């Protein structure tokens, strides 16, 4: 309670349980560290990426819904083919469902940043990338103040951020290489 260092704290007031080593939860303040391998690639990510690619090439391909439903089945939630049969074969509706599935399934895994840029929709409602990031008021002295929704960070998004800058050393190596717009 008297520690004002703010070391090892959440800036937003929210703590993430996903991916946590559950063996450490009940070991008090000083749990013994246990190795837990980090995920580099997840099968669900590949299934959803493949469904997205199939949808762009051939929206009528039955594997699109099968791959999305494989992810949903593993999570124990209703299958798209059962709850939204009307989207099957419709490119736009399937794309919307795949994007939604990626947002939920891959939450806090660092994929959203790249998805939104790949889809080039960072300025659209529901996908916006710039602006304030909200959380709890971590400077509050009481519970009521803590529960107040507070902006703790402001992020910037510019159109040029859809593409990365090409390193100057690479541009200098090639006479035909041109810097990406805005950089």
Positions of predicted regions on the chain:
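Acidic/polar-rich alpha-helix caps and helix-coil junctions
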Residues: 1-183
């Amino acid at each position: 309670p008297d520690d004002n260092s703010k070391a090892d704290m959440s800036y937003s007031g929210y703590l993430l349980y996903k991916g946590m080593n559950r063996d450490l939860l009940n070991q008090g303040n000083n749990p013994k560290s246990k190795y837990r391998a980090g995920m580099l690639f997840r099968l669900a990510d590949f299934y959803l990426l493949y469904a997205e690619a199939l949808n762009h090439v051939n929206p009528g391909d039955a594997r699109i819904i099968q791959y999305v439903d494989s992810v949903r089945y593993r999570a124990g939630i209703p299958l798209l083919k059962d709850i939204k049969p009307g989207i099957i074969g419709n490119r736009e509706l399937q794309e919307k469902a795949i994007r939604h599935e990626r947002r939920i399934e891959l939450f806090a895994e660092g994929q959203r940043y790249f998805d939104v840029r790949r889809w080039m929709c960072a300025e659209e409602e529901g996908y916006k990338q710039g602006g304030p990031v909200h959380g709890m008021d971590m400077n509050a002295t009481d519970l009521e103040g803590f529960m107040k929704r507070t902006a703790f960070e402001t992020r910037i998004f510019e159109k040029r951020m859809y593409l990365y800058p090409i390193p100057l050393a690479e541009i200098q190596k090639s006479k035909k290489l041109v810097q990406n717009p805005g950089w």
